[in-house]
A protein has these predicted regions:
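Sec-dependent N-terminal signal peptides
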Residues: 4-14
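Carbohydrate-interacting regions of secretory-pathway proteins
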Residues: 19-222
């Protein structure tokens, strides 16, 4: 009995995560049943254009329906976000991260991993880009109407990676000299708070088109 207890203690101690090591604990942001982990940007509840069908979050652009960006209740600093998205027809959306609720839209503070019906290596506003700043290096998007698997990773040190369908699309360091040079050469140059929020919300953008999301989960990397 003592021997078994000792072995168990050694196992537990040697498998404890250390500071800075990523956790294996995933928080399920969407369980296929409800939007309890979300609300609207600067609103208490999601717009009623955001619906759930067949365990999928769907933004439906129908007359009389109110959309707006769908935003996480929680705030995140260093994390790995995994999800799948689909454009049922050509359109535009995005995953905006480290969002602060200030004057103006979510993208005034948060960088965006672009969702679009077009993807070409080098396209700064194409799918997978950090919108208008860092283009995807490869094209890995599936056909319109098919699902795409995304991993958005922000590591300590503000090192960001965009992955889609098992391909690394781009990587960069927020706040670096290269980052700042690109921001200063973009439409964001006069947006004082852009990319400066250290811990913020994640938004699924309503850009006026239908977009679907599923299998949304996140884990801390600090």
């Amino acid at each position: 009995m003592i021997k078994s207890f000792t072995l168990l203690s050694i196992f537990l101690l040697t498998n404890l995560p250390t500071y800075g090591e990523e956790s294996n604990h995933w928080d399920i942001l969407f369980d296929g049943k409800n939007l309890n982990n979300f609300r609207g940007y600067k609103k208490e509840k999601p717009g009623n254009a955001w619906t759930i069908e067949d365990k999928v979050i769907k933004l439906k652009k129908e007359k009389g329906k109110v959309g707006g960006d769908l935003m996480t209740q929680g705030k995140y600093r260093f994390f790995e976000l995994q999800l799948e998205w689909c454009l049922p027809k050509p359109g535009n959306s995005g995953i905006i991260f480290r969002v602060g609720e200030t004057d103006g839209p979510a993208y005034k503070t948060g960088p965006e991993m672009q969702i679009f019906h077009k993807m070409n290596p080098g396209g700064k506003t194409d799918t997978g880009s950090c919108y208008a700043l860092y283009p995807p290096k490869v094209a890995s998007m599936n056909k319109i109407g098919e699902w795409n698997k995304v991993r958005l990773v922000i590591k300590p040190g503000n090192k960001v990676e965009h992955h889609m369908n098992e391909k690394l699309l781009c990587s960069y360091t927020m706040g670096s000299k290269d980052w700042q040079n690109r921001v200063n050469s973009s439409k964001f140059k006069n947006w004082e708070l852009f990319g400066t929020v250290e811990k913020g919300h994640i938004c699924f953008q309503d850009h006026g088109n239908e977009v679907w999301f599923r299998k949304v989960r996140i884990k801390s990397l600090q």
